Amino acid sequence: MHIALGYRWFPTAAGYHIERALQALGHTVTYIGLPCSQRAGYDTTVPVDEIVAALPEKPDLYLWIDPAGRYFPPGIERLPIPTACYLIDVHLGRWREQAARFFDVVFIAQKDYLERFQQAVGHDQVYWLPLAAAPDVHRDHHLPRIYDVGFVGNIALAHRKTARARRLRLIAERFRTNDFYRVYTPEEVGRVYSQSRIVFNCSIAGDVTMRVFEGTACGALVLTDTVANGLDELFEIGREIVVYQDDRDLLEKIAYYLAHEEEREAIARAGQARTLREHTYIHRMERLIYLVSSSHLLAPMRTVPAAERWRARREVYIHLHMLDALIDQARDMGLNPFQRARAILPSLLRRLIL
């Protein structure tokens, strides 16, 4: 299959691993996302149907992957080929419900949002497709496990007044860790987790993150906060991964599993086996291709009146190019939620009016 892939290229993003998995499965992938220093691409204003029409070989599928760095090109609903999207951060913004209506088949990373997106899209071609690990990158390097606790994540989050930031500080004060504030390459992520006895995870909004799969794939015990979104279907809690309830429980369980090496390693081995058996990007893309190939319904935006299509695209545009950018700026300034609202609203209103 020839797949036209739209996302923002970045070597630690899910899109990067998805592209490699599709290629490993024998598919031809043409990148038509945003340009960057590593590869050519297209501006957000270029209609995607024109891009696809100009390709030397007609694709069999257009796949758009969130987050795409504010890349949501016009013309998706005019594409003469099946379209699909993989919405990852569904827990962070409801604009994705409007974006989903532009695609024939919709995949979301968090199970608890299935019903909401099925209602928004208006048909049942909306599927749960959890995140995963890339075993060529996220693997056990068989290095000495010199860190009690390992964590690789968003640097900006470490500076915010969040549960994740607070817990990272508590861990760093008590245990030997890697440098939480450093930016790591994909290969370095695998090495850090291979050097960690325990991989710490704290979700942003109750989501099952990439870190759960990456840490287990590298042979570490993953200790994550208690969340829904199908976590207990993906792993057997207590046998393949461990969960904590609060700060105190987190610290106590870290100390316990550091002191009980055989028990820790048994859970780590079981978690690793489960991930490699069921939770790689190869597994996810096999399911995605199967479901797309068996789909029969069309995206709502292919047939709705132009005015409705314009309103939906406008909502997506406002969030991608205005609201999300303003929220990011406010967060980077260290503002609390009330301060963010006061800072964002005047600027947003000015942009909408002008």
Task: List each language-model region with its residue ranges.
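Nucleotide-sugar donor-binding catalytic core of glycosyltransferases
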Residues: 1-51, 56-75, 88-237, 323, ...
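Short beta-strand/loop segments at the ligand-binding rim of alpha/beta enzyme cores
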Residues: 77-85
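Small beta-barrel nucleic-acid-binding modules, principally OB-folds
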Residues: 190-191, 253, 257
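Residue-level signal for the nucleotide or nucleotide-sugar donor/cofactor binding architecture
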Residues: 210, 245, 279
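Catalytic phosphate/metal-binding cores of nucleic-acid and nucleotide-processing enzymes, i.e., regions
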Residues: 250
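C-terminal amphipathic helix plus adjacent low-complexity
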Residues: 259-354
